[in-house]
């Protein structure tokens, strides 16, 4: 019997991981899924055998997790994140980066130390494309930390990362909302690429043009775009089938492996 841990089990990536586990592994697999937000008594995450509500930074939440199978898990999927977005990555302050890392990165090595996990899967994006460099803010630094961690395994626990193209998520919606608000005064948009989408254009139309710009850049760089839930699930299945994968990239229908992290110093 294999135990699987999903942190952030209600999000797009978390639900994709759960679906992929159910499809790939046998029915005796046990999934423990964690979520945090506005508490809903009795809520159970679909596809999970046990649901744990709580902030992963709280000791009581981690102790609950450890109570399952003595803290021994075949896989952990770390699918939660929170950080300041809507500003250029290069403009994020250290305070903003630290705040983003608190949930988006720091718990990963902490859980690696506290639990007995065979493989940890984290998540990233193509944050070095021009559109992401101009809007991904502090989250870009947290994702870089994840990518550096992915290639730094000491062999005790396997590290893997699914790097995905733009898909609809709380983070992408947050960026669009912040851009809509910021664009009301064009002086707030210092980045010339961003500014070009909103000049002499209603903010709602500017957001659409911005999103189309991301899709166009992704397609030019990686061969496809418009990543959806099915694509994300297929990326997980590809990871399960691979022999010691490092990065599994997914952009639209295209999925491919790679070994090198994206380093911001080459772009900012």
Residue positions per predicted region:
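Short-chain dehydrogenase/reductase
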Residues: 7, 98-106, 135-153, 225-227
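Rossmann-fold cofactor-recognition segment
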Residues: 43-61
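C-terminal helical subdomain
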Residues: 159-161, 180-265
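N-terminal Rossmann NAD(P)H-binding glycine-rich loop of SDR-like oxidoreductase domains
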Residues: 5-26
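Conserved mid-core segment of classical short-chain dehydrogenase/reductases
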Residues: 81-98
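Catalytic loop of short-chain dehydrogenase/reductase
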Residues: 119-156, 160-196
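Conserved NAD(P)H cofactor-binding loop of Rossmann-fold oxidoreductase domains
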Residues: 76-86, 124-125
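NAD(P)-cofactor binding segment of oxidoreductase domains
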Residues: 62-68, 94-118
